[in-house]
Amino acid sequence: MTGPWTLTPRLDRMAPTRHHHAELAALWESPDARLLVVDPRGGVSTEPFGQPTAEAGGLPGYDDQRDVLLGRTTTEGREQVWFARRGDVEQGRTLRESTFEGAELELVTAATAVLAWHDSARYCERCGAATEMAGGGFQRRCTGCEREVFPRTDPAMIVAVLDDEDRILLGHQAAWPEGRVSILAGFLESGESGEHAVVREVYEEAGLQVTEARFLSSQPWPYPRSLMLGFVARAHGEIRVDEQEIAWAQWYSRTELDAAIEDGLTLPGQGSIAGRIIGAWRAGELPAPEGALRI
């Protein structure tokens, strides 16, 4: 299964540079420095994508309490250093609304996630004092007890559940618009492996017993700070949805799904791991869950 998240990252995150204010300030002044302004929805401007830092509004120069160093990209031999900040964007497009690819996908995902974390981490969880940005924007430090905290990522599994006839299970969440379906997903609990989360969530949401599960790939999803762990699984039993989170679910053959789509059923977009997993199954390219390596 292929997708926009490749093994080799396009974004060099420049972690060693984050703690050197003078270097960050010099990078900001570089003619190759670019700024992504991200609105509270996660929307960014796409026409153009990013702007020279020299054209950024507000206070001049790099501000270590406002600007986040995302890292460096190289496109067609040209290097650019990218920063991000929270702000207003006219007609901004989010990851859900646009199909970003390559370096742009990594930049928007990182910016959306880290700025959402800053919005929610302004006070210390230990003593309640205000925190301040540090580490080039990938750290916060408490002004009271000096505790240092870092951006959190919440792991979640997402799974294509197949039956013995190679049909796929698709469910409709109660909060979704009518006709929208996807594969099952859920957050990992404390001390739980991804495979165990697959077994638990499939049983809780659909009443099915998983007998095999295989890891496929992962995708960061910054709404607000998830890392989606993609699986394919084999399950048996009678579908029994919880009717709270999942309103209904059913098995689909490829022919049945094609017909349902013609009748108005909607699937996740190909920019999401859910859409790519479903697409791989429809094309007959999804690996079988049997034979997964156990270590």
Predicted ranges, named:
Residues 109-162:
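Cys/His-rich short segments
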Residues 140-182, 187, 209-210, 214, ...:
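N-terminal strand-loop-strand
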Residues 1-121, 132, 176-181, 242-295:
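Nudix hydrolase/Nudix homology domain
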Residues 192:
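Surface-exposed, charge/polar-rich loops and edge strands
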Residues 219-240:
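Active-site-adjacent beta-strand/loop module that shapes the phosphate/pyrophosphate-binding cleft
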Residues 198, 202:
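Hydrophobic alpha-helical positions that pack around
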Residues 132-135, 207-216:
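Short, well-structured beta-strand/strand-turn elements
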